[in-house]
Curated annotation (Swiss-Prot):
The gene is purT. InterPro entries: ATP-grasp, ATP-grasp_carboxylate-amine, ATP_grasp_subdomain_1, PreATP-grasp_dom_sf, PurT, PurT/PurK_preATP-grasp, PurT_C, Rudment_hybrid_motif. PANTHER family: FORMATE-DEPENDENT PHOSPHORIBOSYLGLYCINAMIDE FORMYLTRANSFERASE (PTHR43055:SF1). This is Formate-dependent phosphoribosylglycinamide formyltransferase. One of its GO terms (molecular function) is magnesium ion binding. It holds the Pfam family PurT_C. Residues 120-309 form the ATP-grasp domain. N(1)-(5-phospho-beta-D-ribosyl)glycinamide binds at residues 22-23, 82, 287, 356, 363-364. Keywords: ATP-binding, Ligase, Magnesium, Metal-binding, Nucleotide-binding, Purine biosynthesis.
Length: 395
C-alpha cells in the first residue's frame, strides 16, 4: 500500500479492527498518526480502541452474517483481527471471493484462532520442537491424556486467551477441578482442550517477529512472568545465549514464514540453556509487548502499523533495560484510579490506563512502564508504580 489517503474523505485508507481492547487501542493510535481512517468493532460498547477510532460497531464477531454485513458496509482496505473470537472462516471466504485483505492472512487468522491449528502446524507440519500434547473432547479422553503424558501437565481450552480456563496439574486431586474449569472458563464455553506435558524451562520469552516489505525483523527477546496463564510482568531485553537466540529466531522465522502476510507476530517460546521449544504464536501485537511502549523507538504497535501498510522498517532501536507491570482489578464496577501522580514521580516511568468501561470479575485495566540501568531495577520500579496506584471499582 504505497499511497495513504485522508481520513473521512473519498481518498481515505480504511482499516477495520476486529477486536477493540487495549492492544487494538494502541494499534488504532499508530494508524491515526499515519492518517488512516480507523473503524473499531467488538462485542461490547465503548471498548478501548473504539474511544480513539473514527467509527465503531458493536457486533458478535462469531456471527458470520453480522461479520459479512459489517465488512460490506465499511468496505475496508484492510481487516485487522485483534482477538481470537472471530468467525475466521468468513474471512477466508471473503478473501477468496472478493480479494479482502486480512492481516496477516485469513489462513493465519483461522489457524491461530485456536491452539489446535497452530500446534499441529508447528509440530506435525513444520517439525518444530514442542511439549508433548494431546487434544481431547471428553472427560474420559482428558483423563487418559493426563495418564499418558504424566504429571505435572497443563490443560487449556483450545479457544481461550489470557489464561482463561487454563490450569497446571501437579497432583491427582487437581485433575477433576481442572477439567471443570477448562469447560467453564474458556472464551468459547465447553469443548475441546489440549493437554500439554510440562517443560522444565529456565525462562519463557516472546520474540516479536515482524514480516514487512523489506523482509523479516526481530525485536530483542522479551522475558515475562505469568500467573494463572496471564501476563503480569514483562521486560526487555531478556538475557539469553547467542545459540538460544539464534534458535529462537530460526523457529520464529519458520512459523511466521508459513503463516505469511505482513504484520507483527508474537511468538512464545520456552528456553532451557541453549534449547528452545515453540509454545504459541499470535499474528498481532502481544500483551507482553506492552513494554515496547518505552523500550523501543518503534513500539510493537508502530511496527505492526508500518508493516501492514507496506511502509519500511529500516531499523528497530532499543532504548535500554525496560519493564512493564500489569494493573489488575477484581470485582464488579467501573474502574477509578488513585495515586497516579505517585506512580509517575520516579523518572523514566510511564502509565497507560486502558479505558475499559467496566470490570466483571478479573480484568487487566492498565500497565506501568519503566526504564532503568538494569532489568532488575526497571522491574522493581514498574512494580512499585503499579502498587502505588489503587484501582477502585464503583457502581
Amino acid at each position: 500500500m504505497a499511497k495513504l489517503g485522508t481520513p473521512l474523505s473519498p481518498s481515505a485508507t480504511r482499516v477495520l479492527l476486529l477486536g477493540s481492547g487495549e492492544l487494538g487501542k494502541e494499534v488504532a493510535i499508530e494508524l491515526q498518526r499515519l492518517g488512516v481512517e480507523v473503524i473499531a468493532a467488538d462485542r461490547y460498547a465503548d471498548a478501548p480502541a473504539m474511544q480513539v477510532a473514527h467509527r465503531s460497531h458493536v457486533i458478535d464477531m462469531l456471527d458470520a452474517m453480522a461479520l459479512r454485513a459489517l465488512i460490506a458496509q465499511e468496505q475496508p482496505h484492510l481487516v485487522v483481527p485483534e482477538i481470537e473470537a472471530i468467525h475466521t472462516e468468513t474471512l477466508v471466504q471473503l478473501e477468496q471471493e472478493q480479494g479482502l485483505r486480512v492481516i496477516p492472512t485469513a489462513r493465519a487468522a483461522r489457524l491461530t484462532m485456536d491452539r489446535e491449528g497452530i500446534r499441529r502446524l508447528a509440530a506435525e507440519t513444520l517439525g518444530l520442537p514442542t511439549s508433548p500434547y494431546r487434544f481431547v473432547d471428553t472427560e474420559a479422553e482428558y483423563r487418559a491424556a493426563v495418564a499418558a503424558i504424566g504429571l505435572p501437565c497443563v490443560v487449556k481450552p483450545v479457544m481461550s486467551s489470557s489464561g482463561k480456563g487454563q490450569s497446571t496439574l501437579r497432583s491427582e486431586a487437581e485433575i477433576a477441578p481442572a477439567w471443570e474449569y477448562a469447560q467453564t472458563g474458556g472464551r468459547a464455553g465447553a469443548g475441546r482442550c489440549i493437554v500439554e506435558g510440562f517443560i522444565d524451562f529456565d525462562y519463557e520469552i516472546t520474540l516479536l517477529t515482524v514480516r514487512h516489505a523489506g523482509g523479516t525483523s526481530f525485536c530483542a527477546p522479551i522475558g515475562h512472568l505469568q500467573k494463572d496463564g496471564d501476563y503480569r510482568e514483562s521486560w526487555q531485553p531478556q538475557p539469553m545465549s547467542s545459540a538460544a537466540l539464534a534458535r529462537a529466531e530460526e523457529i520464529s522465522r519458520a512459523i511466521t514464514d508459513d503463516l505469511g502476510g505482513w504484520g507483527l507476530f508474537g511468538v512464545e517460546l520456552f528456553v532451557k540453556g541453549d534449547e528452545v521449544w515453540f509454545s504459541e504464536v499470535s499474528p498481532r501485537p502481544h500483551d507482553t509487548g506492552l513494554v515496547t511502549l518505552v523500550s523501543q523507538e518503534l513500539s510493537e504497535f508502530a511496527l505492526h502499523a508500518r508493516a501492514i501498510l507496506g511502509l519500511p522498517i529500516p531499523v528497530i532501536r532499543q532504548s535500554g533495560p525496560s519493564a512493564s507491570c500489569a494493573l489488575l482489578a477484581h470485582g464488579e464496577g467501573v474502574p477509578y484510579f488513585n495515586n497516579v501522580a505517585a506512580a509517575l514521580q520516579v523518572p523514566d516511568t510511564a502509565v497507560r490506563l486502558f479505558g475499559k468501561p467496566s470490570v466483571h470479575g478479573h480484568r487487566r485495566v492498565g500497565v506501568t512502564l519503566a526504564r532503568a540501568e538494569t532489568i532488575d531495577e526497571a522491574r522493581a520500579i514498574a512494580r512499585d508504580a503499579a502498587e502505588a496506584i489503587g484501582v477502585e471499582l464503583r457502581p
